[in-house]
Protein backbone atom coordinates (compact mmCIF):
# COMPACT_ATOMS: atom_id res chain seq x y z
CA UNK A 1 0.00 0.00 0.00
CA UNK A 2 1.27 3.46 -0.89
CA UNK A 3 -0.02 6.72 0.56
CA UNK A 4 -0.24 10.04 -1.25
CA UNK A 5 -0.80 13.37 0.46
CA UNK A 6 -1.71 16.44 -1.55
CA UNK A 7 -0.44 19.26 0.59
CA UNK A 8 2.74 19.29 2.65
CA UNK A 9 1.75 21.38 5.65
CA UNK A 10 1.26 20.54 9.30
CA UNK A 11 -1.39 17.88 8.74
CA UNK A 12 0.62 16.15 6.03
CA UNK A 13 3.66 16.10 8.29
CA UNK A 14 1.61 14.82 11.22
CA UNK A 15 0.11 11.99 9.15
CA UNK A 16 3.43 10.94 7.63
CA UNK A 17 5.23 11.08 10.97
CA UNK A 18 2.47 9.11 12.67
CA UNK A 19 2.23 6.42 9.99
CA UNK A 20 5.98 5.86 9.91
CA UNK A 21 6.29 5.87 13.70
CA UNK A 22 3.52 3.27 13.90
CA UNK A 23 5.28 1.16 11.27
CA UNK A 24 2.12 0.84 9.20
CA UNK A 25 3.60 2.61 6.15
CA UNK A 26 7.30 3.09 5.45
CA UNK A 27 8.53 6.53 4.44
CA UNK A 28 9.47 5.47 0.90
CA UNK A 29 5.84 4.41 0.37
CA UNK A 30 4.60 7.94 1.11
CA UNK A 31 4.60 10.78 -1.42
CA UNK A 32 3.52 14.36 -0.73
CA UNK A 33 3.08 17.26 -3.13
CA UNK A 34 3.34 20.99 -2.63
CA UNK A 35 3.96 23.98 -4.92
CA UNK A 36 6.29 25.34 -2.23
CA UNK A 37 9.47 23.40 -1.49
CA UNK A 38 10.96 25.76 1.09
CA UNK A 39 8.40 25.14 3.85
CA UNK A 40 9.66 23.87 7.23
CA UNK A 41 7.27 20.93 6.98
CA UNK A 42 8.66 20.01 3.56
CA UNK A 43 12.17 19.96 5.03
CA UNK A 44 10.93 17.77 7.88
CA UNK A 45 9.23 15.38 5.45
CA UNK A 46 12.40 15.20 3.37
CA UNK A 47 14.47 14.32 6.44
CA UNK A 48 12.00 11.51 7.20
CA UNK A 49 12.60 10.02 3.76
CA UNK A 50 9.18 10.88 2.35
CA UNK A 51 9.07 11.35 -1.44
CA UNK A 52 8.30 14.94 -2.43
CA UNK A 53 7.05 16.47 -5.65
CA UNK A 54 5.56 19.68 -6.97
CA UNK A 55 3.15 17.67 -9.13
CA UNK A 56 -0.21 16.66 -7.65
CA UNK A 57 -0.70 14.35 -10.63
CA UNK A 58 2.47 12.50 -9.71
CA UNK A 59 1.21 12.08 -6.16
CA UNK A 60 -2.00 10.51 -7.49
CA UNK A 61 -0.08 8.25 -9.86
CA UNK A 62 2.05 6.78 -7.08
CA UNK A 63 -0.59 6.28 -4.40
CA UNK A 64 -3.41 3.93 -3.46
CA UNK A 65 -4.82 5.97 -0.56
CA UNK A 66 -4.88 9.68 -1.41
CA UNK A 67 -5.28 12.26 1.38
CA UNK A 68 -6.44 15.76 0.41
CA UNK A 69 -4.70 17.73 3.15
CA UNK A 70 -5.19 21.27 1.85
CA UNK A 71 -7.39 24.21 2.81
CA UNK A 72 -11.06 23.99 1.79
CA UNK A 73 -10.85 26.86 -0.70
CA UNK A 74 -8.29 25.04 -2.84
CA UNK A 75 -10.09 21.67 -3.02
CA UNK A 76 -12.13 22.44 -6.19
CA UNK A 77 -8.97 23.35 -8.12
CA UNK A 78 -7.18 20.24 -6.87
CA UNK A 79 -10.04 17.99 -7.96
CA UNK A 80 -10.22 19.61 -11.39
CA UNK A 81 -6.49 19.07 -11.78
CA UNK A 82 -6.26 15.43 -10.64
CA UNK A 83 -9.71 14.13 -11.61
CA UNK A 84 -8.56 12.45 -14.81
CA UNK A 85 -5.77 10.67 -12.93
CA UNK A 86 -7.94 9.18 -10.18
CA UNK A 87 -8.55 5.51 -10.93
CA UNK A 88 -10.73 2.76 -9.54
CA UNK A 89 -8.00 1.65 -7.11
CA UNK A 90 -7.79 5.04 -5.41
CA UNK A 91 -9.41 5.82 -2.08
CA UNK A 92 -9.75 9.61 -1.97
CA UNK A 93 -9.80 10.87 1.62
CA UNK A 94 -10.82 14.50 2.08
CA UNK A 95 -9.54 16.08 5.31
CA UNK A 96 -10.75 19.60 4.51
CA UNK A 97 -13.18 21.18 6.96
CA UNK A 98 -16.65 21.74 5.57
CA UNK A 99 -16.03 19.96 2.25
CA UNK A 100 -18.83 17.42 1.80
CA UNK A 101 -18.62 13.98 0.28
CA UNK A 102 -21.17 14.93 -2.37
CA UNK A 103 -19.13 17.94 -3.51
CA UNK A 104 -16.00 15.81 -3.94
CA UNK A 105 -17.92 13.03 -5.68
CA UNK A 106 -19.60 15.52 -8.02
CA UNK A 107 -16.23 16.84 -9.18
CA UNK A 108 -14.67 13.40 -9.63
CA UNK A 109 -17.71 11.92 -11.38
CA UNK A 110 -16.97 14.21 -14.30
CA UNK A 111 -14.05 11.88 -14.94
CA UNK A 112 -15.24 8.47 -13.72
CA UNK A 113 -18.62 7.00 -12.72
CA UNK A 114 -17.86 5.65 -9.23
CA UNK A 115 -15.07 7.46 -7.34
CA UNK A 116 -14.35 6.05 -3.89
CA UNK A 117 -14.50 9.01 -1.52
CA UNK A 118 -14.24 9.12 2.27
CA UNK A 119 -14.59 12.27 4.36
CA UNK A 120 -12.28 12.39 7.35
CA UNK A 121 -11.75 14.76 10.26
CA UNK A 122 -8.61 14.22 12.26
CA UNK A 123 -6.27 16.44 14.28
CA UNK A 124 -2.57 17.18 14.59
CA UNK A 125 -1.86 14.91 17.60
CA UNK A 126 -1.67 12.07 15.06
CA UNK A 127 1.98 13.18 14.92
CA UNK A 128 2.48 11.54 18.35
CA UNK A 129 -0.02 8.75 17.63
CA UNK A 130 -2.66 10.30 19.89
CA UNK A 131 -4.98 11.70 17.24
CA UNK A 132 -8.77 11.73 17.25
CA UNK A 133 -10.27 10.79 13.88
CA UNK A 134 -13.76 10.19 12.55
CA UNK A 135 -14.71 9.33 9.00
CA UNK A 136 -17.83 8.98 6.85
CA UNK A 137 -18.16 6.74 3.82
CA UNK A 138 -18.98 8.03 0.37
CA UNK A 139 -21.57 6.59 -2.02
CA UNK A 140 -19.15 4.32 -3.87
CA UNK A 141 -16.64 3.55 -1.11
CA UNK A 142 -16.55 -0.12 -0.16
CA UNK A 143 -16.59 -1.59 3.34
CA UNK A 144 -12.98 -2.70 2.91
CA UNK A 145 -12.01 0.87 1.95
CA UNK A 146 -13.32 2.11 5.28
CA UNK A 147 -11.55 -0.72 7.07
CA UNK A 148 -8.28 0.22 5.40
CA UNK A 149 -8.62 3.87 6.40
CA UNK A 150 -9.55 2.87 9.94
CA UNK A 151 -6.48 0.63 10.09
CA UNK A 152 -4.32 3.57 9.03
CA UNK A 153 -5.85 6.12 11.38
CA UNK A 154 -6.15 3.74 14.34
CA UNK A 155 -2.38 3.35 14.18
CA UNK A 156 -2.06 7.04 15.05
CA UNK A 157 -4.80 7.37 17.68
CA UNK A 158 -8.53 6.87 18.13
CA UNK A 159 -10.63 6.33 15.00
CA UNK A 160 -14.29 5.54 14.45
CA UNK A 161 -16.92 5.80 11.71
CA UNK A 162 -19.77 8.32 12.04
CA UNK A 163 -22.58 9.71 9.93
CA UNK A 164 -21.42 12.63 7.83
CA UNK A 165 -23.79 15.11 9.49
CA UNK A 166 -21.82 14.72 12.75
CA UNK A 167 -18.46 15.71 11.28
CA UNK A 168 -18.98 19.47 11.62
CA UNK A 169 -19.54 19.03 15.36
CA UNK A 170 -16.46 16.81 15.56
CA UNK A 171 -14.48 19.58 13.86
CA UNK A 172 -15.54 22.00 16.58
CA UNK A 173 -14.67 19.58 19.37
CA UNK A 174 -11.63 17.45 18.55
CA UNK A 175 -10.56 18.98 15.24
CA UNK A 176 -10.03 22.40 16.82
CA UNK A 177 -9.60 20.92 20.30
CA UNK A 178 -5.79 20.81 20.40
CA UNK A 179 -5.72 24.59 19.90
CA UNK A 180 -8.02 25.03 22.91
CA UNK A 181 -5.72 22.81 24.95
CA UNK A 182 -2.59 24.69 23.87
CA UNK A 183 -4.20 28.02 24.73
CA UNK A 184 -5.26 26.68 28.14
CA UNK A 185 -1.77 25.30 28.72
CA UNK A 186 -0.19 28.63 27.81
CA UNK A 187 -2.48 30.39 30.29
CA UNK A 188 -1.74 27.83 33.02
CA UNK A 189 1.98 28.31 32.47
CA UNK A 190 1.52 32.09 32.67
CA UNK A 191 -0.21 31.56 36.00
CA UNK A 192 2.69 29.49 37.23
CA UNK A 193 5.18 32.13 36.10
CA UNK A 194 3.14 34.84 37.83
CA UNK A 195 3.41 32.84 41.04
CA UNK A 196 7.18 32.49 40.67
CA UNK A 197 7.80 29.32 38.66
CA UNK A 198 10.42 29.23 35.89
CA UNK A 199 8.73 29.22 32.45
CA UNK A 200 10.11 25.87 31.33
CA UNK A 201 9.01 24.15 34.53
CA UNK A 202 5.58 25.82 34.42
CA UNK A 203 4.95 24.62 30.86
CA UNK A 204 6.08 21.08 31.69
CA UNK A 205 3.94 20.85 34.83
CA UNK A 206 0.88 22.22 33.02
CA UNK A 207 1.33 19.80 30.11
CA UNK A 208 1.79 16.86 32.46
CA UNK A 209 -1.34 17.84 34.38
CA UNK A 210 -3.42 17.87 31.18
CA UNK A 211 -1.86 14.62 29.96
CA UNK A 212 -2.43 12.88 33.28
CA UNK A 213 -6.02 14.11 33.55
CA UNK A 214 -6.83 12.89 30.03
CA UNK A 215 -5.27 9.50 30.71
CA UNK A 216 -7.16 9.12 34.00
CA UNK A 217 -10.43 9.78 32.18
CA UNK A 218 -9.70 7.43 29.29
CA UNK A 219 -8.54 4.65 31.61
CA UNK A 220 -11.60 4.87 33.86
CA UNK A 221 -15.35 4.65 33.43
CA UNK A 222 -15.95 7.68 35.62
CA UNK A 223 -17.63 10.89 34.52
CA UNK A 224 -15.33 13.92 34.23
CA UNK A 225 -17.30 15.63 37.01
CA UNK A 226 -16.59 12.74 39.39
CA UNK A 227 -12.87 12.91 38.66
CA UNK A 228 -13.02 16.67 39.18
CA UNK A 229 -14.76 16.22 42.54
CA UNK A 230 -12.08 13.74 43.60
CA UNK A 231 -9.49 16.53 43.42
CA UNK A 232 -11.52 18.97 45.50
CA UNK A 233 -11.06 18.89 49.27
CA UNK A 234 -13.68 20.73 51.36
CA UNK A 235 -12.54 24.31 51.76
CA UNK A 236 -9.36 23.56 49.83
CA UNK A 237 -7.37 25.38 47.17
CA UNK A 238 -8.85 23.53 44.19
CA UNK A 239 -12.50 24.24 44.95
CA UNK A 240 -11.65 27.92 45.38
CA UNK A 241 -9.92 27.87 41.98
CA UNK A 242 -12.92 26.16 40.37
CA UNK A 243 -15.27 28.75 41.84
CA UNK A 244 -13.14 31.45 40.21
CA UNK A 245 -13.32 29.64 36.85
CA UNK A 246 -17.09 29.27 37.14
CA UNK A 247 -17.52 32.97 37.93
CA UNK A 248 -15.60 33.77 34.73
CA UNK A 249 -17.83 31.58 32.59
CA UNK A 250 -15.19 28.92 31.97
CA UNK A 251 -17.64 26.21 30.89
CA UNK A 252 -19.66 28.56 28.71
CA UNK A 253 -16.52 29.79 26.97
CA UNK A 254 -15.52 26.25 26.00
CA UNK A 255 -19.04 25.35 24.89
CA UNK A 256 -19.21 28.54 22.83
CA UNK A 257 -15.79 27.83 21.30
CA UNK A 258 -16.93 24.41 20.08
CA UNK A 259 -20.12 25.97 18.73
CA UNK A 260 -18.23 28.78 16.96
CA UNK A 261 -15.87 26.34 15.25
CA UNK A 262 -18.79 24.14 14.19
CA UNK A 263 -20.77 27.10 12.82
CA UNK A 264 -17.77 28.34 10.86
CA UNK A 265 -17.29 24.86 9.40
CA UNK A 266 -20.90 24.90 8.21
CA UNK A 267 -20.37 28.35 6.70
CA UNK A 268 -17.37 27.02 4.79
CA UNK A 269 -19.51 24.12 3.60
CA UNK A 270 -22.27 26.46 2.42
CA UNK A 271 -19.78 28.69 0.62
CA UNK A 272 -18.20 25.67 -1.05
CA UNK A 273 -21.60 24.34 -2.14
CA UNK A 274 -22.39 27.73 -3.71
CA UNK A 275 -18.84 27.99 -5.07
CA UNK A 276 -18.32 31.17 -3.06
CA UNK A 277 -15.30 32.04 -0.95
CA UNK A 278 -14.31 35.01 1.17
CA UNK A 279 -12.24 37.85 -0.37
CA UNK A 280 -9.17 36.80 1.65
CA UNK A 281 -9.56 33.18 0.58
CA UNK A 282 -10.17 34.30 -3.01
CA UNK A 283 -6.86 36.17 -3.05
CA UNK A 284 -5.08 33.11 -1.66
CA UNK A 285 -6.88 30.82 -4.11
CA UNK A 286 -5.70 32.87 -7.08
CA UNK A 287 -2.13 32.70 -5.82
CA UNK A 288 -2.39 28.97 -5.21
CA UNK A 289 -3.93 28.44 -8.62
CA UNK A 290 -0.99 30.16 -10.30
CA UNK A 291 1.31 27.76 -8.45
CA UNK A 292 -0.84 24.78 -9.40
CA UNK A 293 -0.81 25.75 -13.07
CA UNK A 294 2.96 26.23 -13.14
CA UNK A 295 4.53 24.07 -15.89
CA UNK A 296 7.25 22.87 -13.52
CA UNK A 297 6.61 19.27 -12.47
CA UNK A 298 10.09 18.41 -11.26
CA UNK A 299 10.54 16.10 -8.33
CA UNK A 300 12.55 16.58 -5.19
CA UNK A 301 13.71 13.26 -3.80
CA UNK A 302 14.64 12.83 -0.13
CA UNK A 303 18.12 11.63 -0.96
CA UNK A 304 18.99 14.74 -2.98
CA UNK A 305 17.44 17.78 -1.29
CA UNK A 306 19.28 20.23 -3.48
CA UNK A 307 18.80 18.56 -6.84
CA UNK A 308 15.74 18.75 -9.05
CA UNK A 309 14.93 15.62 -11.00
CA UNK A 310 12.40 15.19 -13.79
CA UNK A 311 12.19 11.41 -13.64
CA UNK A 312 9.28 9.59 -12.02
CA UNK A 313 9.48 8.33 -8.48
CA UNK A 314 9.90 4.61 -8.03
CA UNK A 315 7.81 3.69 -5.04
CA UNK A 316 7.98 -0.01 -5.64
CA UNK A 317 5.51 -2.30 -7.36
CA UNK A 318 4.74 -4.55 -4.41
CA UNK A 319 1.92 -3.67 -2.09
CA UNK A 320 2.46 -3.90 1.65
Swiss-Prot record:
Start-end of Low complexity biased regions: 295-305
Recorded GO MF terms: pyrroline-5-carboxylate reductase activity
Reaction equation(s) it catalyzes: L-proline + NADP(+) = (S)-1-pyrroline-5-carboxylate + NADPH + 2 H(+); L-proline + NAD(+) = (S)-1-pyrroline-5-carboxylate + NADH + 2 H(+)
Lyase is among the record's keywords: no
UniProt keyword Cytoplasm present: yes
Record-listed E.C. numbers: 1.5.1.2
Region (Disordered): 295-320
UniProt-annotated binding residues for NADP(+): 6-11, 34, 56, 69-72, 95-97
Top-rank lineage group of the source organism: Eukaryota
InterPro entries: 6-PGluconate_DH-like_C_sf, NAD(P)-bd_dom_sf, P5C_Rdtase_cat_N, P5CR-like_CS, P5CR_dimer, Pyrroline-COOH_reductase
One GO CC term, this protein: mitochondrion
Protein's pathway: Amino-acid biosynthesis; L-proline biosynthesis; L-proline from L-glutamate 5-semialdehyde: step 1/1
Compartments (UniProt record): Cytoplasm; Mitochondrion
Protein's job: Oxidoreductase that catalyzes the last step in proline biosynthesis, which corresponds to the reduction of pyrroline-5-carboxylate to L-proline using NAD(P)H. At physiologic concentrations, has higher specific activity in the presence of NADH. Involved in cellular response to oxidative stress. In some cell types, such as erythrocytes, its primary function may be the generation of NADP(+).
Record-stated family: Belongs to the pyrroline-5-carboxylate reductase family.
Oligomer status and interactors: Homodecamer; composed of 5 homodimers. Interacts with LTO1.
Protein name: Pyrroline-5-carboxylate reductase 2
Source organism of the structure: Macaca fascicularis (Crab-eating macaque)
Gene name in the database record: PYCR2
Amino acid sequence: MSVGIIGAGQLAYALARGFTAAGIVSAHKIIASSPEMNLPTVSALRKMGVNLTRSNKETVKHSDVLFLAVKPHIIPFILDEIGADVQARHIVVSCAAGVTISSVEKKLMAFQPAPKVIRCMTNTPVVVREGATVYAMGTHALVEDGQLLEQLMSSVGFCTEVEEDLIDAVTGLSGSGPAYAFMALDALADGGVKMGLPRRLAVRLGAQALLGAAKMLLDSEQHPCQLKDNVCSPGGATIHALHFLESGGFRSLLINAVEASCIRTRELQSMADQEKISPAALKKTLLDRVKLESPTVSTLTPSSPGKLLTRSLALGGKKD
